[in-house]
């Protein structure tokens, strides 16, 4: 399948998310499904912490389009199943989380892991194996500090492996810092970003808007699936 022609770069604050990325030592490119800001309301002010971009393997458009083409952007945005199909889809994903303000690695991973555990417990996938995976996940971040512009990359495979790498800018490192083989945890990481209780509603909206355009292109040119 060809990469959608309608794909564009996205800017989140001072962060640039290019339309395509190719990791080092790889011939495979990933396209930008969407990007948005993650923040919290603190004392009646929305404080922005991170810009998140979700990149996908090119076959994701045809895979998702089989079910979702023809839907409006608003319909996609309102459908949790659409986002769950992204999360659980049989294609690789590369998530880029770049910092807008300084974050301590331990504090960052504490909140992320709490959200992941809460989701896994709610859907009944949190067992001893996931508890061990969460411990590995936390250990990977314990010595990290993230100044503005630095990045965490999460590489997700359909089989359930979660690769973690850290960069002082937006450059994808050649080697992963850690690889955790646990599908419930891998899915939970993206679920907490774009699922039922998302940390980035802006990312969800970006995905819906952009995939609506990708699906229109797919309908106009069915050969794009080949």
UniProtKB/Swiss-Prot annotation:
InterPro entries per UniProt: CFI (IPR044164), Chalcone_isomerase (IPR016087), Chalcone_isomerase_3-sand (IPR016088), Chalcone_isomerase_bundle_sf (IPR016089), Chalcone_isomerase_sf (IPR036298)
UniProt source species: Glycine max
Function: Catalyzes the intramolecular cyclization of bicyclic chalcones into tricyclic (S)-flavanones. Responsible for the isomerization of 4,2',4',6'-tetrahydroxychalcone (also termed chalcone) into naringenin.
Keywords assigned by UniProt, alphabetized: Flavonoid biosynthesis, Isomerase
Gene: CHI1B2
EC primary class: isomerase
Keyword Lyase: no
Induction: In roots by B.japonicum.
Source organism phylogeny: Eukaryota, Viridiplantae, Streptophyta, Embryophyta, Tracheophyta
Protein family per UniProt: Belongs to the chalcone isomerase family.
Tissue distribution of the protein: Expressed in roots, shoots, flowers and seeds.
Residues of the site described as Important for catalytic activity: 108
One Gene Ontology MF term: chalcone isomerase activity
Pathway listed: Secondary metabolite biosynthesis; flavonoid biosynthesis
Other noteworthy facts: Part of the biosynthetic pathway for all classes of flavonoids, a large class of secondary plant metabolites, many of which are brightly colored.
Superkingdom assignment: Eukaryota
Enzyme Commission numbers on file: 5.5.1.6
One GO term (biological process): flavonoid biosynthetic process
UniProt binding sites for substrate: 50, 115, 192
Gene3D superfamilies per UniProt: 1.10.890.20, 3.50.70.10
Catalytic activity, as annotated: a chalcone = a flavanone
Protein's name in the database: Chalcone--flavanone isomerase 1B-2
